[in-house]
């Protein structure tokens, strides 16, 4: 049976380039999705063993079929990527870690998942076992809470006005679909930005539903505590707020000195670096990839090499 692939992995060539020198040990794909990145890496690294995680049951089910030829080298696990480091074995043997923290094309295009502005549902949960969906947020959050979401996560200047419109409409009838919400928010653009106001608002709601920024910070903090040895980490993000967080952590990890900037002379020992930043600038999709997959336009990848001396 030929499987119809529901998602194109972004920055596939660039991911393979980052991990090209891996030989043995374990590779952790924290956000397996539909297996595109892992499939390519499994083919090119025959001596690597894989731990593949995702919180989406549908994605895991599909990927188990897609990667069945590699079943002797791969362990599957359902988990949010912020929790996966606490659950896995072979931590000391990790040589590569990949986290692609975007929404898959399958999730965006699946009407029942409620991610798209054209959806008849209002859900947006990446983990369908989660209790809070977009429906609860839109219909129960206070005007102040909604304003905060649109301002902080969507960076929308008229966040208060959008929240006010939502509260007014739901006082008449509960908002039950993404289509309805789209009509309420409107189609306009946010000043000079190319992305529509509705897209930014939907993105903000999705971040709140899935606690995406908190999850990312938790994951990076767990890595910081773990201090992997001789391990490459690559993170693909699709939102400027996420990319900013990754950039800040990588910068922090690369520093030897952790003294207060106001101190004239180092007092910390100047030996706190966990490794080196591999990517001086975030890697973006090539022109060729953009032509094939327009959804890769927001993707940015940063990579870090852990070689901390304390763990040697």
UniProtKB/Swiss-Prot annotation:
This is Ribosomal RNA small subunit methyltransferase H. Keywords: Cytoplasm, Methyltransferase, rRNA processing, S-adenosyl-L-methionine, Transferase. The lineage of its organism: Bacteria, Pseudomonadati, Campylobacterota, Epsilonproteobacteria, Campylobacterales. Belongs to the methyltransferase superfamily. RsmH family. Its main location: cytoplasm. S-adenosyl-L-methionine binds at residues 35-37, 54, 81, 100, 107. Gene3D superfamilies: Putative methyltransferase TM0872, insert domain, Vaccinia Virus protein VP39. InterPro entries: RsmH, SAM-dep_MeTrfase_MraW_recog, SAM-dependent_MTases_sf. Specifically methylates the N4 position of cytidine in position 1402 (C1402) of 16S rRNA. One of its GO terms (cellular component) is cytoplasm. SUPFAM superfamilies: Putative methyltransferase TM0872, insert domain (SSF81799), S-adenosyl-L-methionine-dependent methyltransferases (SSF53335). It is an enzyme of class 2 (transferase). It catalyses: cytidine(1402) in 16S rRNA + S-adenosyl-L-methionine = N(4)-methylcytidine(1402) in 16S rRNA + S-adenosyl-L-homocysteine + H(+). It is found in: Cytoplasm. One of its GO terms (biological process) is rRNA base methylation.
């Amino acid at each position: 049976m030929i499987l119809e692939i529901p998602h194109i992995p972004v920055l596939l060539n660039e991911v393979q380039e980052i991990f090209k020198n891996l030989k043995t040990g374990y590779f952790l794909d924290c956000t397996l999705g539909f297996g595109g990145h892992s499939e390519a890496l499994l083919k090119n690294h025959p001596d690597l063993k894989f731990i593949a995680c995702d919180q989406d049951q549908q994605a895991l089910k599909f990927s188990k079929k897609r990667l069945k030829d590699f079943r002797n080298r791969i362990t599957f696990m359902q988990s949010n990527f912020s929790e996966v480091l606490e659950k896995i074995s072979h931590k000391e043997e990790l040589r590569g870690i990949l986290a692609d923290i975007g929404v898959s094309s399958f999730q965006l295009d699946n009407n029942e998942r409620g991610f798209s502005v054209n959806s008849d549902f209002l859900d947006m949960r990446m983990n369908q076992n989660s209790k809070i969906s977009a429906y609860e947020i839109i219909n129960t959050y206070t005007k102040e809470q909604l304003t905060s979401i649109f301002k902080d996560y969507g960076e929308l200047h008229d966040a208060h006005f959008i929240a006010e419109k939502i509260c007014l409409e739901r006082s008449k009838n509960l908002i039950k679909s993404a289509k309805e919400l789209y009509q309420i928010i409107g189609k306009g653009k946010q000043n000079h930005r190319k992305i529509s106001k509705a897209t930014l608002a939907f993105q903000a709601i999705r971040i709140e539903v899935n606690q995406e920024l908190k999850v990312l910070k938790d994951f990076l903090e767990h890595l910081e505590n773990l201090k992997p040895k001789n391990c490459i980490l690559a993170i693909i993000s699709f939102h400027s707020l996420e990319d900013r967080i990754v950039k800040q952590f990588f910068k922090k990890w690369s520093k030897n000195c952790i003294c207060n900037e106001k101190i004239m002379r180092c007092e910390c020992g100047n030996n706190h670096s966990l490794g080196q930043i591999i990517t001086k600038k975030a890697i973006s999709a090539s022109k060729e990839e953009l032509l094939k997959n327009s959804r890769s336009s927001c993707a940015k990848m940063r990579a870090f090499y852990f070689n901390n001396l304390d763990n040697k």
